[in-house]
Amino acid sequence: MITAYLAAATAAQALLPAGKGDPTWFDNPALTQKFGPAILETLMMTGLSTIFAVIIGTLLGLVLVQTGKGGLTPNKGVYQAVSFVVNIVRSLPFIIGIIMLIPLTKLLVGKSTGSLATVVPLVILSAPFFARLVETNLLAVDPGKIEAAQMMGASNRQIRWGVLIREAMPALIQSITTLAITLIGYSAMAGAVGGGGLGQMAINYGYNRWQDDVMISTVVAIIVIVQIIQLIGDILSRLVDHRAR
């Protein structure tokens, strides 16, 4: 199955022999016809992956904080089990992980290549990374505020969402920004194995056909996307930071 997947992922590359004298820039069909869709594919992969990774990672992070030492409901067994799984998944290199998850990807979306299929491994491999960021952010919340909420009779659910998440929101937004930027890089790497988007375009045309204009354009596009994401993240983080008011 893995051999078939890699063969499919490199099929486009085999059909793109390096051609001397290819049209460049605005005369290059790769840029005029495929550049825009490739950007949209990258944004789609990153957007969907970020949303699902944030949901799953936040829940895992809350479990780690609540069951850890000094948490609302300490449970060493649960904490160690969740922490072990998180560490195992985090240790997997993305390219290896995306190949290992081929059966699950095909089961969920019906195919193992393309931008939509890439979302599955992106979410699974990045959610544990975000879970650790959430854990770090929540552990940084002043314990005095948690104790004050407990003294006022707040439930664990109210403390989780009304104290921990609320107080850590600026840091959480910065962590979401970091996650989204990381996923941009992951989605580009996925292009090497048929993942679609700017990464696959850079491989197929920029590398295999030695079209420097395509390579430069994809790199610039990724840089611009990253800068915009970082800018939005910084603005949102400042807006929700009640300490800066």
Where are the regions that the model predicts?
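Cytoplasmic-entry segments and transmembrane alpha-helices of multi-pass inner-membrane transporters
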Residues: 63-101, 122, 133-136
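Short helix-to-coil transition segments within interhelical loops
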Residues: 138-168, 208
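Transmembrane alpha-helix signature in integral membrane proteins
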Residues: 35-66
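C-terminal transmembrane helix and the adjacent membrane-cytosol boundary/short C-terminal tail
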Residues: 63-69, 216-245
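Short, strongly hydrophobic alpha-helical membrane anchors
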Residues: 1-37
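Non-cytoplasmic
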Residues: 104, 175-225, 231-234
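Transmembrane alpha-helices
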Residues: 156-187
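Loop-to-helix entry region at the N-terminal start of transmembrane alpha-helices
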Residues: 37-45, 90, 94-129, 214-218
